[in-house]
């Protein structure tokens, strides 16, 4: 124990310190020297000091006044129990100290052993001979010290304050009183023993001793000249290194200031302190801070307004107060305007995100270079796929596609196979999975497909590679539960799991089922399901974990930011996660727009973002067109027929237009256009036959006769019926016997201009022995066409969203093989994706879509591999109706498609497709296009629709304008499909 002082109160406190276990060698030397000193005393070579009155230990008696010394003079006591107290001698007088100092000059300077009672050895015996046998190690007695200096022991500071005495090494005191000190010579082997416990711990952390030495060296103006010799202390060497490092830093700073002075203007003098401080502040700016300051100094007002959180008031304030010399001054000055600092923060955030995007682009450029180079090389040489069924041969372009997938697999990269519809993406995936099984990568792999294509996938696996063990996870809730129980015992034997989008994202039990597998590849067919990162479905699909992913899509990349960003994050989630937290941060960068952007500037801004996104996606997409790879594919001809509406139909249409002209409501453009489209297609899609009086009678009859309506008031039932179309009311009356007398005459199904045109076309097609596909956007229209076909006596099949999923492929196979079936009725949404109907070569689009790519998907159901006849496509348009405007808009978009050129790896460089837009299988139109179409329909003039129909199609605004209207259509369809899938029976292989 030792005593020291609390520097706040002056109170003496006891501080415990422990010996250093690493100082054993030093202790042994000292014990040997003590023994030698004791021997000399006993032999009479030295005179003993008069004995003290108290025993060994702490002496609290009267203290001898001591000479004022530095902190180095406060030493710790060492007491030898074997030495009697009367033999102790005080060698503190100045004469002996001078003699000792003379002796020290013979060798290197030695650090003094800290001791209040100095142990002095005879000069002739000062150095122990190597042959001398050391005495047994003496026990060290801990004593209390009167010293108030705790720093030399590296004890903790009291109350967080520094010791006023200073650090242990005070070099000016060493010069002044060197004669009064003895140094302990420490050789290389025992150098570490000089450091006490806390110094060892601080040295281990790499911080403590260096910090303490630098603090000590910074307080004193005079420094000790240290010679780097064998006996030099470790602390002295560290202090010198710290001092030299500090001098070098100061020298570098002075050199930079001198260089700035030389580069300054001629009239600037070194005495100009403000300029020097300004230059120092500028040197302290980060790269982004400097770029931000330069932007606010040089940008024009219109450029300022393009940035986020900058309005006219802030822009004017910037122009009035610039230039800003340093970033800090700019921030302080911008506090003078409301939300001025927010504008700076927003621009700094923009610079940060732009830097993130640049780093991502750099990563992708490396991938693009290697992928492009290896893609050219991978087309050379044969590819053996022995697991494919004998007799099944891939086309050359399909082999290239499989080789590309293998290359992406070897590079551990995700991929998007974007071949045009009809080029056999399914077959390429089956062949690729057979290759993985061939090399021992058995999976399991998960394939997620739309409900309408699940049977086609099953058929392709059995046809091309029956050796792959396929599990089809589908069916009702009870059947899926039973299937999950069965699979537990056979999990290791499954190569591929085939399921639908709703199965993956709907029920928690289904999600847990897929988590039980360590999935290798997750493959998504018809990738438009992953083109909207704002949807719940997208977020659910991204939670499906697999080592790698493949996306299949037949549609080209749209100039749509949401779609491109969604695909980017899907393909590059590992890359993006290094730079941003999730997709919302990525989305914010691309969506960041100023509040005052006009349409032109907004389009240019977003086009730049589109170019960036496409550049990122390039290495990961392979896209080929049919006209590039299928030279022998039969031709396809297209025609548009404008038909005259029947008089009652035209009168109904004109009544709707007149009502819209008189109406002041302009918000529901989508609903108004929908009413016009229904009237242009068939009058039964509106309510004209069932008058209000008939509806009252039907309502009263239902409430009187039917249990389902017994608790309802007939007035309320009548009001509900008033919102339905004629065909829906007719179908309701068919359900109940009591209302059968209110059924419509079936001949009304023939009373439309388009049905009359079918009377002209269908007989001619039938005479040629060809088959026909008829597509419609409305299931109600398909109901009317069924009545029409029954009246005319044509055999047909029908497929829409309500068709049981597992019945669909059976219907398709039956239609392709049967010679008696003549017509196939399909809804554009359900029948336009992933099905093969090459037995038909005539396509009739009964009612066109806002998006021409939806109609093109329908065309590709028969214009694809396996087609042997020329394909004829006919679009029916009611003359003088809103459909004329829709057709003009579609022509504009289809013309833009012709301007595309080939890009990397055959991918289309579809930069010209600015106005194209596609959302998850639904028809959709931008808000501005809806307004233009409605205005043209009301005025009856459609000449100006084509001129600038795409102005709002390039960005997110058009998307948001139609978002609410689209959700009203899309959500019920998705829920209905999900409910339908859960009610279907399951199959598993």
Curated annotation (Swiss-Prot):
Composition bias, Acidic residues: 72-105, 187-200, 251-276
This enzyme's EC code(s): 3.6.4.12
Keywords: ATP-binding, Chromatin regulator, Chromosome, DNA damage, DNA repair, DNA-binding, Helicase, Hydrolase, Nucleotide-binding, Nucleus
Keyword DNA damage annotated: yes
SMART domains: DEXDc (SM00487), HELICc (SM00490)
GO molecular function: ATP binding; ATP hydrolysis activity; chromatin binding; DNA binding; helicase activity; nucleosome array spacer activity
Pfam families assigned: Helicase_C (PF00271), SNF2-rel_dom (PF00176)
Main location (coarse class): nucleus
GO cellular component assignments: chromatin; nucleus
InterPro entries: Helicase_ATP-bd (IPR014001), Helicase_C-like (IPR001650), P-loop_NTPase (IPR027417), SNF2-like_sf (IPR038718), SNF2/RAD54-like_C (IPR049730), SNF2_N (IPR000330)
Localisation per UniProt entry: Nucleus; Chromosome
Keyword Transmembrane found: no
Binding locations of ATP: 419-426
UniProt-listed GO biological process terms: DNA double-strand break processing; positive regulation of transcription by RNA polymerase II
Enzyme class of the recorded protein, top EC level: hydrolase
Chain ranges of the Helicase C-terminal domain: 757-912
Biased composition (Basic and acidic residues): 124-140, 201-221, 241-250, 277-288, 950-982
Stored CDD domains: DEXHc_SMARCAD1, SF2_C_SNF
Top-level lineage group: Eukaryota
Family to which this protein belongs: Belongs to the SNF2/RAD54 helicase family.
Protein name: SWI/SNF-related matrix-associated actin-dependent regulator of chromatin subfamily A containing DEAD/H box 1 homolog
Species of origin: Caenorhabditis elegans
Name of the gene this protein is made from: smrd-1
